[in-house]
């Protein structure tokens, strides 16, 4: 009940008409009224912080899995559309730390956001009834995993402090963990690899090179 309430209120108060989301919403503690949108780790209160968009996609996909409530599935589909069709999403599908960062393309990428998105898309692709959408999600996720598994992002053994992935961004406005490894980047990368390996995607197996790591 609490999770459903939180997810529904978040749709109302965190998301914009284009299905991007803000990082923080300030509430009146007496009336519970939403007072303003803000950010803590994003570029601005009106920007689309990349990992925040990834969390939203992952979260509403999970909410649909647990509840079978179609409104959560539709929310996940809408968030995926915002992410995948954003003009600032690079060709290799690993986002900049914020979709609205001011110096794109000279901004850090966030491998953690890419890993979260890939894992979410692989799950979401199983739930949608539209075969075209399912193929798009699965193909983008596979592309993200190939990118993250390249020398650009995948650390050599016994380097990178023992972490798997390079080039994540924790909190750029406060210059914390910028272009750094992050534990949760590794977690969602491994989760996405396992999902890619264990879920049967016929069109991917037929037309895409299967990742050597899986």
What positions do the PLM features span?
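Conserved small/polar residues in nucleotide/adenosyl-binding loops
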Residues: 202-209
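A beta-strand-loop signature enriched in Asp, Gly, Thr, and Trp
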Residues: 71-134
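Carbohydrate-binding/catalytic loop surfaces
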Residues: 18-49, 92-116, 157-181
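Well-ordered alpha-helical segments within folded domains of soluble proteins
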Residues: 1, 48-65, 107-126, 181-197
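C-terminal hydrophobic structural anchor segments
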Residues: 115-164
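Long, well-ordered core segments of solenoidal/helical folds
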Residues: 2-20, 29-36, 75-92, 139-158
């Amino acid at each position: 009940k609490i999770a459903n309430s939180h997810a529904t209120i978040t749709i109302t108060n965190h998301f914009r008409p284009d299905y991007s989301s803000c990082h923080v919403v300030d509430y009146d503690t007496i009336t519970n009224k939403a007072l303003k949108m803000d950010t803590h780790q994003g570029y601005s209160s009106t920007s689309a912080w990349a990992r925040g968009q990834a969390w939203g996609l992952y979260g509403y996909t999970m909410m649909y899995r647990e509840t079978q409530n179609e409104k959560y599935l539709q929310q996940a589909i809408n968030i995926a559309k915002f992410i995948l069709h954003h003009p600032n999403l690079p060709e290799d599908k690993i986002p900049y730390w914020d979709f609205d960062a001011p110096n794109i393309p000279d901004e850090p990428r966030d491998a953690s956001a890419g890993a979260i998105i890939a894992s979410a898309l692989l799950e979401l692709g199983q739930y949608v009834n539209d075969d075209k959408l399912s193929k798009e999600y699965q193909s983008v996720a596979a592309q993200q995993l190939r990118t993250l598994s390249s020398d650009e992002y995948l650390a050599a053994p016994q380097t990178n402090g023992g972490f798997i992935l390079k080039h994540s961004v924790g909190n750029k406005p406060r210059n914390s963990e910028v272009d750094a490894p992050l534990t949760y980047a590794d977690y969602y990368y491994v989760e996405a690899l396992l999902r890619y390996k264990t879920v049967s995607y016929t069109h991917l197996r037929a037309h895409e090179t299967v990742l050597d790591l899986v």
